[in-house]
Structure formats: C-alpha cells, structure tokens
C-alpha cells in the first residue's frame, strides 16, 4: 500500500499535467503591463499558453477576464483604425461578453470587479454599434454591470469612467436615467482614483481619455462658478443617503475638492493639459492618437 502511494507521488511529480503549477505574480504583472502598452495580441498569446497552468477557479477567472479585456481592446482599436467591420466586431464582442460572464460566475476576491466591468464594456460597445434604440435597451444591464464592478472593488476606476459616459449620453427621465450632474461626478471620481493609482505607481501610464471625458461632461453641464458652489453643496445630503459605492459616486463632487472656477474654465484647462502632454511625446499609441484628436475637437 505504501509502495503504491509512493509510486503515485513520484508519477505526479514527473508527468506533466498531473500537478498544476500556480501562475506567478510576475506572470500576472507581465500580462497587465502588456495590456497597459496596448500589446493585446501578445497578451492573448500568453494567456493561451497559461490555460493549462491555472490552478482553481480564481486563477481561471483571472485568465478569463484578462482575455475579455484583451479581446475588447483589440476590437475597439481595430474599429477605430478601420481594420474591422462592425458586423465582425459584433460577433467578436458577443464572445468577449461570454468570456467575461464566465469569469464573473467563477471568480472570487477582486476578480469580479474586472469581470463585471469587461462584460459591461462589451455590452456598451454592442449597443453603440447597433444604434440608439439598442443602446437604450442595454442601458439597465450595463448599469448593473458597472454597479457590480464598483461593489466588488470601490477603488477600481473603470466603472466610474464608463458610467460618466453612460449618464451623459442617455436621455433623462422619463425615457431613461441620463443625468448630466451625475455624469460629471462619475467622471471626476474616475480621474481622482486614476491619479491616486498613477501617483502610487500602480499604473505606468496616464489614462488621458479620462480627463477628456471629464472635460466633455463639464462642458455639457456648463455651470458657472457661483452655481457650482451652490449646487455642489446641495449634493451633500444625497451623498450621505447613498448606500453603495456606485450611488455615492453619483454625488462625489460633494466630498472632493473642486477648483474655484466655472465648468467651462476647468474643461479648458483639462483639455489643454491633455493636448500639451500628448503633443510633447515623441511617439503616440493608436489610443493616444485618438484621445488627442478628441481633445483637439472639444477644445475648438
């Protein structure tokens, strides 16, 4: 009996696949850094190679949401570059959504934040490609994905970034839940969280589109300095009554420092910051080229 057990132990340590090694933190970090550099094809290749290495649901979920993230960003940038048709993009986005959904079902810890977010991102892009009516139809599901992402990790900036766009672009009551004031608060929350992460060295690059979307939402709201001071002060009660991180982010301006200027003046400063920063770089990624183009258009 003991000899049989010893033989099984020896077999497990010598035959590939019988014991699954854990994915190391260095491997996760490499994948995430490649993502930040928009090297998504490389990310997908590495993830494919690690599929047989994952040990347990948490690691498998980590592979899945990272695959969904890479797939989504590949699709998004290929659409912008004119390298992918909208029909093909819709098919691929459906698969991306399914991948993120699988990650959300099996993951634990902080992983659901990313899983829910990338499922929502794929859903949002599908709605955008299909037109206004489909975007309205998907809005509630997208908001729920963003809410779940924020619940899983309140310090994760992405759901607030997308919520800022969602609440800005949707019509308000009674058609939908669009709200320009909430859009600004969501965008400001995303920028502040990103600034904290960037300053702490948790992300290697600035997400310039965060600042552009905040500027866009400020311009759309268009409050004067005096009105800002008065109405933002009135948000405090709503912030205190909010029960979840996502709801509190809707009134985030009540609890953060706001520049003593109008919405338009702050938006102009943000756009100038983005334009000057990107124009000073020797080489821009496709994503940053798009962001610079958007910033210039809004600054006109």
Regions found by a protein language model. Name each.
Residues 24, 61, 113-114, 157-158, ...:
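Helix-start (N-cap) detector for alpha-helical repeat units in TPR-like alpha-solenoids
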Residues 157-162, 202-219, 288-295:
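Amphipathic alpha-helical protein-interaction segments enriched in hydrophobic
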